[in-house]
Each structure stands twice: as C-alpha cells, then as structure tokens.
C-alpha cells in the first residue's frame, strides 16, 4: 500500500522517522495565461512564473522563459508586465490571489507538481515507546486531518470551477477550454 511504501522510504534513507500524511495539496494547475495555448510555440511566448528549482529549470530546458518569485509578488508582476503568465497552486488559492483579474485562460493539471504533502513526523524511538492506544489515537487523528483536508480542497476548488456557458459578464469570466467560470 501507499503507507507501506511511505514507511519503506524512511528506512531506505536511513532515518528513524514515523510519518503521517495529514494535508495533501494538489494537483496544481499549469497556470494562468493571457491567450489560449494550442501548442508549445504558444507556451514559449510567455515569461512564466514557475516554482524555483527543478520545476523552473525543467521549464527553461524546454524553452520556457521561467521566472521564480514569491506568491505575493505575482499579481503586481503581472500588472506591471514583468511576467506574462503565472502558476501558483490550484483554483481556490489562485482565485484568492486574484490572477483572474488580469489573465483569462486557466489550464488545470500542471507539469510540475502532482501533489504536495504536509506531514506530521515523530522519531521512531518516540513512536515505538507509545502505548497501542496512543499509536491508534495518533493514526486516527492523522487520518481525520487527511479526510478533512481532502474534502475541504475538493469542495473549495470545485466551487471555484463552477462552469457556466452563459456568463453574465464575459469580461469577468475565465476561459477553461471553451467553458467559462465567473
């Protein structure tokens, strides 16, 4: 199972860690663009805010002008023309940042980040010293956090992607592959 592979990973890294997944985020969107992207030539036209590190370098390697910057700098950079397109996270956080105010084309499922996990870790020594009841309590709490986080993200991101074909104000809607969101 996934949990067994997760535990095996810590062993292979030589770490005495007991980890619990408590808050997954993802998948992240490809991002926001001023015009539709029909092929890689369209994509390569933009100065694109991407995550730093391997994702940013990967985009550069395929010919994308990748620019790394913090989340709070993205909207001002878009408004100033420092960048032309951007990715941040997923529907709810992206709309909260207001990217839809300046970019109207949003593409889901990015190339760079399928999932991010916020985990809870304790040392194996500490975990092994716990009673069976304490271990079970920790497992139940982690699973409850995981379930709550997943359901919240599905609900909130889904609400941000409510589709309508007859948007009241086309200028305030966002194109999602021929469908509109307001």
Please name every model-derived segment.
Residues 11-165, 173:
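N-terminal secretory/targeting leader peptides
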Residues 5, 161, 180-181:
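Polar low-complexity intrinsically disordered regions enriched in Ser/Thr and small residues
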Residues 2-9:
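A gly/proline- and charged-residue-enriched helix-loop-helix capping module
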Residues 1-2, 149:
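Residue-level preference for long, well-ordered alpha-helices that form the structural scaffold
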Residues 167-169, 174-182:
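Positively charged, low-complexity/disordered segments
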